[in-house]
Amino acid sequence: MSKAFDLVIIGAGSGGLEAGWNAATLYKKRVAVVDVQTVHGPPFFAALGGTCVNVGCVPKKLMVTGAQYMDQLRESAGFGWEFDASTIKANWKTLIAAKNAAVLDINKSYEDMFKDTEGLEFFLGWGALEQKNVVTVREGADPKSKVKERLQAEHIIIATGSWPQMLKIPGIEHCISSNEAFYLEEPPRRVLTVGGGFISVEFAGIFNAYKPVGGKVTLCYRNNPILRGFDYTLRQELTKQLVANGIDIMTNENPSKIELNPDGSKHVTFESGKTLDVDVVMMAIGRLPRTGYLQLQTVGVNLTDKGAIQVDEFSRTNVPNIYAIGDVTGRIMLTPVAINEGASVVDTIFGSKPRKTDHTRVASAVFSIPPIGTCGLTEEEAAKSFEKVAVYLSCFTPLMHNISGSKYKKFVAKIITDHGDGTVVGVHLLGDSSPEIIQAVGICMKLNAKISDFYNTIGVHPTSAEELCSMRTPSHYYIKGEKMETLPDSSL
């Protein structure tokens, strides 16, 4: 016998849980949420809380925080701290155990949420579409596996997230993804992270801090520079600082084959013919929408050419009662975006009028060492979007690094404006506290702040953030897409 619900959600990640909670508490609807695992770890990794909580933002931030102590300990000597450096060692097992405990606490809090919230029910298993109003809960991902439950659904939200992409090359079975990296029993002595995106860059910093004596971290990327899609100035400066921190960066390189050495290490052959022996190869070449087990074809849900579920601005699919949110839509793969989409889509379904998520001016961060904070358009994007663009740029050594021994750690601040009216359309930061600073900047940009609002604001001294209140003169411009050091005519 099937159970009837106002809303069935496939996927218990950040977006799905937000949607379920709001529907049950704000609209008093009967809601079912389906997912394959309740607590973090193998075999399926993404449990209650989704990628972010289990194998993404949360554990990654904890591990990056741990990694930052390496530099802080070294730099403390400049501030008068004296200790025997030979007695200091990093304990990877302690880090992983603490990380696991913190994630488990969050998993348990979500379990309690289901127990304590009237109208909200969790089903353990693989959710798939049988009809446009019927979701099956199976024992496995295989559509032939045993059906545990059939759920009647007036409305359905698909929120199954994304999954690490792996290269299709010989020997890929000898590699791990970021999922497994969170559960390594020992820090790798020699490690190759494949990819130039934020996951690869962040793990390179983690591994570099915790590597055993004599270890080496290498990052390879098929293009140049790393972090495609981010501000070009920041990409270049971050590369310099990663190299200064001891990370090898191989650009315009991509593995073509992975072989297992007799001692268990990996022999990597690159497309250029170069080779490298490492203990661990971690693939971090991107993430793909997780749709394979959903049986979308049974009801004709359309996909994009990249395999994401196709939705409109209100997260509606082409099937009237079926919606999709978060990574599975291939829009902006960020947890706060999925949460906002989850809240918006529930308002659309059960509220008085449709509500959409604003995907513009979304602040985000890369928790590299040093970190990046970014919001809005890059230089290149702004030059294509506006007739006249002004770029304000500052690169300086933060006060602490004048005595920390790390003068190479520059702070970069860039403000990009529509020079027609002075509206700030992009802000990009590199350096300590950039992710914290950019959140406040995002609020300013949401309110359509102008460059004059920034420089007429009195800064907090001495901070790196105050630089945003001091930038009055553009470093260069773009006129109809052409870069110029000065304006050709004062009337512009």
Curated annotation (Swiss-Prot):
Is Disulfide bond there in the keyword field?
yes
Query: GO CC annotations?
Result: cytosol; mitochondrion
Q: How is the cofactor bound?
A: Binds 1 FAD per subunit.
Record field: catalytic activity: trypanothione + NADP(+) = trypanothione disulfide + NADPH + H(+)
Location in or out of the cell: Cytoplasm
Task: Write out the GO biological process terms.
Answer: cell redox homeostasis; cellular response to oxidative stress; glutathione metabolic process
Give me the residues that bind FAD, please: 35-52
Keywords attached to this Swiss-Prot or TrEMBL record, sorted alphabetically, are: Cytoplasm, Disulfide bond, FAD, Flavoprotein, NADP, Oxidoreductase, Redox-active center
Q: What is the effect of changing residue 18 to A?
A: KM=266 uM for trypanothione
According to its UniProt record, the EC number is 1.8.1.12
A single Pfam family it belongs to is Pyr_redox_2
Tell me the cofactors it needs.
FAD
Cystine crosslinks? 52-57
Q: Which Gene3D superfamilies does this chain map to?
A: 3.30.390.30, FAD/NAD(P)-binding domain
Annotated Gene Ontology MF terms? flavin adenine dinucleotide binding; glutathione-disulfide reductase (NADPH) activity; trypanothione-disulfide reductase (NADPH) activity
Catalytic site? 461
Q: What else is known?
A: The active site is a redox-active disulfide bond.
* Task performed by this protein: Trypanothione is the parasite analog of glutathione; this enzyme is the equivalent of glutathione reductase.
Q: How does it assemble?
A: Homodimer.
Alphabetical list of PANTHER family matching this protein: GLUTATHIONE REDUCTASE
Family, similarity comment:
Belongs to the class-I pyridine nucleotide-disulfide oxidoreductase family.
Protein's name according to its UniProt entry: Trypanothione reductase
Protein species of origin: Trypanosoma congolense
Upper classification of the organism: Eukaryota, Discoba, Euglenozoa, Kinetoplastea, Metakinetoplastina
Gene name of the record: TPR
